[in-house]
Amino acid sequence: MSQLSLSWLGLGPEVAFPWQTLLLFGASWILAQILTQIYAAYRNFRRLRGFPQPPKRNWLMGHVGMVTPTEQGLKELTRLVGTYPQGFLMWIGPMVPVITLCHSDIVRSILNASAAVALKDVIFYTILKPWLGDGLLVSAGDKWSRHRRMLTPAFHFNILKPYVKIFNDSTNIMHAKWKRLISEGSSRLDMFEHVSLMTLDSLQKCVFSFDSNCQEKSSEYIAAILELSALVAKRHQQPLLFMDLLYNLTPDGMRFHKACNLVHEFTDAVIRERRRTLPDQGLDEFLKSKAKSKTLDFIDVLLLTKDEDGKELSDEDIRAEADTFMFEGHDTTASGLSWILYNLANDPEYQERCRQEVQELLRDRDPEEIEWDDLAQLPFLTMCIKESLRLHPPVTVISRCCTQDILLPDGRTIPKGIICLISIFGIHHNPSVWPDPEVYNPFRFDPENIKDSSPLAFIPFSAGPRNCIGQTFAMSEMKVALALTLLRFRLLPDDKEPRRQPELILRAEGGLWLRVEPLTAGAQ
């Protein structure tokens, strides 16, 4: 074997080649990587000095536990936003920085960045992947861009119009249930419980053309979705269980995978049946049969859509997008509508004005049903919805981790790789963005009052390339359900003030309870 003298390095006499040389090079490479990381961290820390920091709880924990997912945590966040209106820096332990942005003028650079640059924070979204696969909520890069383009037609007005009939029907079922409960002496109702089932009922009909009657009787599929949502929210608060290997060994992990399998089996069965039906009928006959029913459901659209190269979505991709829509569509809409009902219950003047607007719209109409064209004829009701979404945004925060440095409008830089939280709740409650932000005032959204506001001052559906693709669907459903509810019921606040609970969506501890009184025909 050839010999190599390393005495000039001070490493002694001749040594064997190549193993010692490879070892030296390997050690040098590792050292170089360590030094590179240390330098990058040092450089990042210097650039992060431009972001103000609240006092740390202690040197080891940093700011961990300072803003908790509780009512008190939201109050602390509101205080921080008042103190640091542009945003602030917090630390997870001694080494992990997290930037929170809470002003509409500052978030523009990140929200408008391409999906390839402003990636979703993988730590949280990874725990959704066993359930939602590579759906729009979880996927990134080229796959996300391709799916986004292919799914956009599913939310075209012509597709959404027939869904308004479904929204009416599902709301009618919920109201019939309310009247029965009230007649039995139960006028105090948990809005989250009832509205969640109503939105799931609508979604199952819009996505699968399937009626499980879930508002009146138990459904394994609906129960599995509710369980998955609860388990994901619970796991989100337990960072040690983010590791799949550990989580899968827990009782919650086993329940999660059992519920996942049930949901996947249901979706797969629907897709297989549609795949079988489509070639039997042929595309033209399939579309004719759908035209007669006047409804093309979400699965139909996904089966028929093709990309620029004429390629279809795989069955796995269709399942991922359908499951994603069921998850995102029911929770966020249920939260939004529940808090709208709460805010109007607390302000009878606004509630009555909305009611009169609906009564005038539906005067002499039989049956009392909201149609697609009606949705644009409810300006004050729409203002009330938007103000509630400002005060109680269903999604309180979104996270990004950028692949390159992001220059903010004020000249500061967010270094690549740093977790950045865009606090929707913070922006909506920022007194430098919204005067008197804790006051429910629908007139903020009067067209004259809002015309000069930043488009990023109100972002309940996010903004930019990765905004919510289903926001028109959600707004339409909320308008229909709210209009019919105010037409038939008077909403009154509960004796106990709710305590907000920001999980995956903004909930209320122990439910969001209201008292509900049916309106007589004369009162209507």
Curated annotation (Swiss-Prot):
It is a single-pass membrane protein; Peripheral membrane protein. Optimum pH is 7.5. PROSITE patterns: CYTOCHROME_P450. Heme binds at E328, C468. One of its GO terms (biological process) is omega-hydroxylase P450 pathway. CDD domains: CYP4F. It is an enzyme of class 1 (oxidoreductase). The chain crosses the membrane at residues 15-35. Its main location: endoplasmic reticulum. It is found in: Endoplasmic reticulum membrane; Microsome membrane. Coiled coil: none annotated. Expressed in liver. Its cofactor is heme. Pfam families: p450. Keywords: Endoplasmic reticulum, Heme, Iron, Membrane, Metal-binding, Microsome, Monooxygenase, Oxidoreductase, Transmembrane, Transmembrane helix. One of its GO terms (molecular function) is arachidonate binding. Its EC number is 1.14.14.94. It catalyses: (5Z,8Z,11Z,14Z)-eicosatetraenoate + reduced [NADPH--hemoprotein reductase] + O2 = 20-hydroxy-(5Z,8Z,11Z,14Z)-eicosatetraenoate + oxidized [NADPH--hemoprotein reductase] + H2O + H(+); 5-hydroxy-(6E,8Z,11Z,14Z)-eicosatetraenoate + reduced [NADPH--hemoprotein reductase] + O2 = 5,20-dihydroxy-(6E,8Z,11Z,14Z)-eicosatetraenoate + oxidized [NADPH--hemoprotein reductase] + H2O + H(+); 8-hydroxy-(5Z,9E,11Z,14Z)-eicosatetraenoate + reduced [NADPH--hemoprotein reductase] + O2 = 8,20-dihydroxy-(5Z,9E,11Z,14Z)-eicosatetraenoate + oxidized [NADPH--hemoprotein reductase] + H2O + H(+); leukotriene B4 + reduced [NADPH--hemoprotein reductase] + O2 = 20-hydroxy-leukotriene B4 + oxidized [NADPH--hemoprotein reductase] + H2O + H(+). Highly expressed in aflatoxin B1-induced hepatic tumors. Belongs to the cytochrome P450 family. This is Cytochrome P450 4F1. It comes from Rattus norvegicus.
